[in-house]
Each structure stands twice: as structure tokens, then as C-alpha cells.
Amino acid sequence: MKTLHERPDYVLRFDKPKNTEIKHINGRWYLYERTTVYDPETGRSTKKSGRMIGAITEDGLVGKRVEARALREVVVVEAGATQYLYRENGDIRRLLGEHFPDCRRELFSLAVIRMVQDRALKRAEAHYETSILSAMWPGLRLDGPSLTGLLRRLGRDRLSIRAFMRSMAGGGDRFLMVDGHRILSASATLESAEKGYDSKRRYKRQVNLLYLFGIGGDGRGPRFYKKFPGSITDDGTVEELLREAGVEGEDCTLVGDKGFYSNENFDLVEELGLGYIIPLDRGSKVLEGEVPPSHVGYGSAFSFRRRSIYAKRIEGEGWVVHLFLDPHLLAEESADLVARLENKNAGLDKKRRAEHKRRAKGKGRLTEAELAALEEIPVIEHVGDRRVMGTIAIRTNRLDLNSNQVYAIYKERQSIEQLFKTYDCTYEFDASYMQGDFAIEGWLFLNHLTMIMAVRVLDMIRDLGLTDVYSLDDFTQHLRKIKASKVDGKWYPTKVTKKVQALCENLGISLGSVDQIIEQERASAP
């Protein structure tokens, strides 16, 4: 039986045209065409509904919009990660505008794309077209030929690159860490790619990249880089790096690694008026006769990340050496040494047994001296007085710092180690196919921008105590799932999964209006 619905006042007031009828469907009222058709079999005329004309509302008849909906513009793009990086890196956008006004949008877009999507420049244009970047800055030319020209122009302008990096540092860093990194190159036209050894003992064509990493009131991050030919070692490049970066003044302290230790480098940092915190080799003459036989002789102790650290102070002229004993490190090094000696003894025993079997058959190969050399190594005697195991010695001219502070600052070198780990593993920036030194200079600057953004995300995760929960990959892969849809000229956020929503809540990420960003960028366009 057909259900009758009570018609509201606005339907009753509606002036229904001739040859039409009103229907109630799913709680709404619609106007349909109606025709009369004669049926010859029954000899009667029957009413037949035609197409829907429109919906009847309180404002009157709203015409059918099926055709309009089919033709209206609907665009879906990545918005989450890009929107976050846009809001959190306003200083980068501002300084790019100051130093690279003609290509600031391209540079920022490429840095974001390479962090969020793909490091390969050949796919940058495709990612740009499916990102909210294409709505913020329409018409950017990121095709292959355009990017080749951009990198070369950028690489020729080392002065602007240097000015940008100096501006980013801003003089607020209290501590600067210096370290080198090697980038393999397959390019035969790259003059700075020369054969040399790196930390992995690879003797290949490579570029030596030296980096300064800052820690100060404005947070942490990569501050300055300079490339050198691959045949040049790090200790021969530090002076040029520091002078070009404009590093000087007693308010800044340089934190180096063991490769930095040399009298020339100490003279350099003192000439620049810098403080320094530099680790020494365990065989350094300064430590002769100074290493206590046990932790009792160290004089002081403190805890660091739930580990007991013992410390001894060795005074010098204008400097001091802090000698540290880490019992946990001592146990690890002792276990490693004993294991290596045991493995070596097992190998000696195998060779000794084989020789005895051959001699039993009258086929011995070794001399008596060679056989005697295969005798088992007394493990405990070989370990002997290894009092330097588990120790770290650090020289500094910062006489105002105590042992606890010096140790904590030096351990921040893990920051730059994390930087290069991200450089290699996450973004695979350790090999370059750039053709020419200008192109690789531009490529390195793009890497630098991306790494600034990445380190800021890592620091945000670390400050929240969530490094065991979220990685940089988790951040980018989840946030780039947040899309924005453009319907009839207006942007709307799409629904997100529970995992994405949980990440945003845990990291305190709240994304604002996409339209607001687009309007802001259009207003600032030249």
C-alpha cells in the first residue's frame, strides 16, 4: 500500500506547472514531468512519469544539477605533509625570498617534494602536479630541462648559497659540530669527484662534503656545508670551511671528532677566538701515566642516561683534558676483545691439529717455529692491563665547563651522526649522477634545505619523547595520506584513517585551512 506523506507548507504553496507531478523520495520533494499515454489494449489513458525536473525547497524549485555535477571541477591532491612543512618552515621561505627571489617557490617546492615524496628530480614534476603546491604556486616549471638549468644557475651562485646559510645560522649557535661525509659520483664530467678513500674504505670517485651542525637557543640543525675534491682529507679542509662560514667569537664552541685533532687545528680555533671540545686518541701523550687502574682513581662521577660515568681532570696551559670511564663501554669492549681472542684461538687450534695429522702421516708442512707460533694465546694475559678500554678523553679550552657538561655536549655529536644517517639511508643522498660541478652544487643545496626540514621533524619527535614510536618515515608516509579535494573552486579536507589521526594527535599536529594558505601565497605573488 502506498504511503502518503504530509506535505509541508512550502510544497503546498508551490505552483505546480501543467503536466508535472510532485514525488516524495528519501525525505525530499521532487518535481517530475508527467505525460498521458493511451493504451489500446485497455482502451484507457495512463499517466507516466518522465525525467526529474528539480527539487522543491523552501526557496522554491532548484533545477536538476546532474549535468553540472558531471562537469564541475574535482581535484584531489596531497596536502598534509606539505601543509605542515609550509607552516613550520616560514624562516626558510623568507630567506629564500631574500636570497633567491626568482626561484624561491621552485626551491621550497623541490625541498618539500624530496622530503615527502621522492628524491629523484626526474619525478618532481609529477609529484608537484599531485600536491597542494600546484595550487599554492601554479605554473612552476619542474620538468627535466628546466630543473637542469635551475641547478646550474643555482650552483653558479655560491655567494647567495653562502649568504643564505649564514642567515639561517643567525649567530645563535653556542656549539658547532664539524664532520665530513663522502658522496660517490658516477659522473665523468665532475671535476671535484676524485678517487679517494672514505670511512668504508671505498676507493672510488667521490666528493668530500664537510658539514657544520649547530646547537643553540634556536634548536639544532645543519648550518653550513662546503664540498671539496674527494682526494682531500677532512683535516685539510676545516680551516676553509670555518672561514667561509664566518665562524668566530668566544661565544661559539667547536665540537670535533678524533679526526679533527691536530696542533694546526687547535691553533686555528684559537686564532678564530673559538672554544673547542675535541676528543683525543687513547694513545695521546697527554694521557701517558694519567689513566687510573680502576674507577676508584677517577675522583668524580655522575650519571648520564642511566649510566654511571667516572671522570678525571688533567690540567694543561689554557686547556684541560677530561678523562671519562664508561663501565658499560668497558664491558662491551672487554667482551669484544675476549670474543676475538677466542675466535683466533679456535683458528690456531684448527691449524695446529691439521699439522699434527699431517705429521702423523709423515707429510708435515710447517717448521717447528711456525708450529710453535700456533700455540694458544693466553686470553687473560693478552688482555692484561687494558686500563684505556672504556675511556674517552676530551680536550677543551672551555674552563668554565665541568666534566658532566663537557661529556653531555660531546655526546650531542649523535645529532650529526643522525643527520648523515638520514642523508644516506632515508633520502639516499650518498650518490650523485649530477653532470658538472655547478649542477652538483645546486643539488647539494637542495639536499641542505631538505635536511633542515627533516632534522626539525626529528627534533619535534624527540622532544615529545616519541622516538621509539615514530620515525621520520612514519611522519612522511602518514601525513602525505592527508588529501585535500577541490570541489567547485573550494578546498575540503578528506577523511583520514585512524592511524593518521592518532599520529597527528600524538605529535600535536593541527592542520589549518588550505584555502587560507593559497590566498596568502596569491596575495604575496609579484
Predicted region positions:
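Acidic, metal-coordinating catalytic cores used for nucleic-acid/nucleotide bond scission
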Residues: V255-E264, R282-K285, F438-A439
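An anionic, glycine-rich sequence signature occurring as long contiguous blocks
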Residues: F224-K227, L272-I409, Q477-P526
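Short, basic/hydrophobic alpha-helical segments
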Residues: M165-R166, D235-C252, N263
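Short amphipathic alpha-helical "interface-anchor" segments enriched in bulky aromatics
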Residues: Q405-M434
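Dynamic "connector" segments at or just before major functional cores
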Residues: M1-M177, H181-T189, Y211-S231, E239, ...
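Short helix/loop capping segments that flank catalytic or ligand/cofactor-binding pockets
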Residues: E41-T42, A120-R123, A135-W137, S185-A188, ...
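Basic, amphipathic alpha-helical segments enriched in Lys/Arg and hydrophobic/aromatic residues
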Residues: G436-L458
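Active-site cores of enzymes that catalyze phosphoryl transfer or operate on phosphate-rich substrates
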Residues: D118, F164-P229, K350-V388
